Amino acid sequence: MIYLDNAATTLHKPPQVEQAILEALHTAGNPGRGAHEPTLHAARIVLDTRLALAELFHAPDPSCIVFSANATMALNTVLNGVLHPGDHVITTVCEHNSVLRPLYRLRAQGVEVSFTGVDAAAQLCYDQWETLLHPTTRALVVTGASNVTGNGTDLARAADFAHRHGLLFIVDAAQTAGAQPIDVQQLGIDALCFTGHKALLGPQGTGGAYVRPSLRVAPLLVGGSGVHSFDEMHPLQMPTALEAGTLNVHGLAGLCAGVRWLLEQGVENLAAREAALARLFYEQVRTAPGVTVYGDMAMQPRAPIVALNIAQEDSARVADILWEDYGICVRAGAHCAPLMHKALGTVEQGVVRFSFSHFNTEQEVQQAAQAVCALAREILCE
């Protein structure tokens, strides 16, 4: 089996991740719910994970890191916690439904939403931002990189625009956290939402957000906190304010191990290897008859993704053949990014997405490219 669906979830993790989860299953209690060793050990796991992520993102304090089940939950928490009826938001057509659907629901409640388009290479049209600006514009919400094309967002340019106009700068880092260096202080990011199970190399069911210390986010959930139990209102201090209920300590133990491994290896080093693998694949398939590649493969930074179609063949059929005949795992279809597909003209066909990990080998990439070329020849001869 050749696994090239890492933008959906990374299958291959460092062995330390599994070891940490198994150890936590047998040793961790419920953090903040007692003074015995199992609960204290759980609290140490949670703190260690905050510290690791704060180091990775260059956050000023570990209390800026809050945990959730995934990036979707983190985005819902942040967007619903800072936007109100009458506010205006600028976002992009590159966004995942984890951004779009919360914004659509907020739009039904009186929040106005404007979308930035893309050019022929699926690059953001940054110049549109100035034309979309309103007196009531409250936030700029962007993805770090498209989960369809891999095209990255120029976060420095986005930050400059947001800061010049006094906007909140919110980033969906589902595809970039752990895959690209991110310095939230240097960029002046107000909220960075991430998932644990992709490039951060943790297990599914983990994720969260960096929230700028002075930013107040109204909690999406309230309830048990382990502190101030006689208060009717949920505690306001961070990170407790945004972490109602028992945390996924076992998952966080694995996430911490994954992040620590990333820090040891160096995100820049791993990103360079992934970029080289994506480039190797692209160079071998881009001239194959009938193959169309989407996105700007020359731009940097970008996610290690190559999205393509073969003639007019349904992307799902291509993915099925790649798995059944070649043992290659890829993702086909809409990728939960409907506006991106409208911009690309691939609403009906979808695209076949190959996404690479530093755990992949050159041989695997070459085999996948050869399979695409062979399949393209077969389809064109049908």
Which residues make up each language-model segment?
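Pyridoxal 5′-phosphate
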Residues: 1-382
